[in-house]
Amino acid sequence: FKVVWANDKLYILGEFVDDILIDTHRDPLVQYWDDDCLEIFLDEDYSGGNHQFNHNAFAYHLSLDNQAIDIGTDEKPHSYSHHVESRWQQHGNKIIWEVAIDIYADDYVDGSEDNQPVSLSAGKIMGLMVAYCDNDGSELRENFIGSESVPEGPKDRGWIDAGLFGKLVLDE
């Protein structure tokens, strides 16, 4: 994957090889992690720590219909598609996925009209992990391919623990 930024957005370009695309869960809030999807994990201030039911970090699950889902503070899945612009194209077995993301701080409040994205600038340090969930036809996700190595425990803990994210330094 590649990352660039402007003062108002983070841009990510991902390339994946997948011979079978699956989106069997039509309700975007149900088992969204078990369909083919791009996951982008962002910790605005690289503070690490738990973000399972808070916004210390976001775990955007980008579906094949370009919706962005994460778990809210009420412990239920929510659409955060208003944070993300997502488009993908398929070329044979190759998937090219382009994403533009508004970055929010950990004081984000679900449902509030007062949430404002943070401004990005050179030198800012953020936490980032990118993963692809792959399902080739079973009921559950078959593969989780991530950008960061998880040394011990379950390998898919990025949706809980921002301490697993890599360090992203915004450079000029």
Predicted regions and their residues:
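Structural preference for beta-rich elements and adjacent junctions enriched in aromatics
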Residues: 1-172
